[in-house]
Amino acid sequence: MPSGPPGDTLMHRPSLTSQQPLSIFLSLVVAALLLLALPSSPTAQKTALHLDGTPADPFLAASGKPVVLVFVRTDCPISNRYAPLIQRISSQYGARVAFWLVYPSRMASAEKIRQHERDYGYKLPALRDPQHALVTQAQVRVTPEAAVFDANHRLLYHGRIDDLYVDFGRARPAATTHELDDAIQAALSGKTPPRNMPGVGCFIADLE
């Protein structure tokens, strides 16, 4: 059967030129959706810092070991009173547990921290947490508070070190419970950790 005139055939053929804007638009939409699906760049994430200013991950070097983060301030009286106990516990468990002091105050410079460690006899490594990356991860609110993570780096306990302080300025003659010590033993043995107990001390600035 004879075909129609060439002009009739051309009238029903899709125009490539008219399809181009739609194709470009769809390509841009797909590209935008793919970008939104990508995880945030690691450089944009909050991070703790070593005292030399380099990014720090206290869990990275502690593969297979529990991690203990103890949050302190250079100018918090209660935090400073706990220094001998913190140092003693870190020395007791240091071979089996990764211990870190964490300074969440933005005002705590590396030199202030080094001086604070000298003044209070600290021998354990320290980190700065001005962006509160570790504060958020550990769910702490005051200094001093501790966070204990098991060997798989799951948070087991966060809160007070012991119950020595009833309130700010009110202390017992001696502590009757020892949450940090109990939590570390739980992390090492696989037993049930103590219940999270709020700390008594100096509020971390952004959480006041």
Question: For each of these PLM feature ranges, what is it?
Answer:
Residues 62-77, 184:
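Short active-site neighborhood of thiol/selenol oxidoreductases, capturing the structured segment around
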Residues 155-156, 160-208:
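Thiol-/selenol-based redox modules, centered on thioredoxin-like
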Residues 117-158:
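Short, internal strand/loop/helix patches
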Residues 1-22:
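N-terminal secretory signal peptides that target proteins for export/translocation
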Residues 25-37:
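Bacterial N-terminal signal peptides
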Residues 80-120, 128-137:
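Structural microenvironment flanking redox-active thiols in thiol-disulfide oxidoreductases
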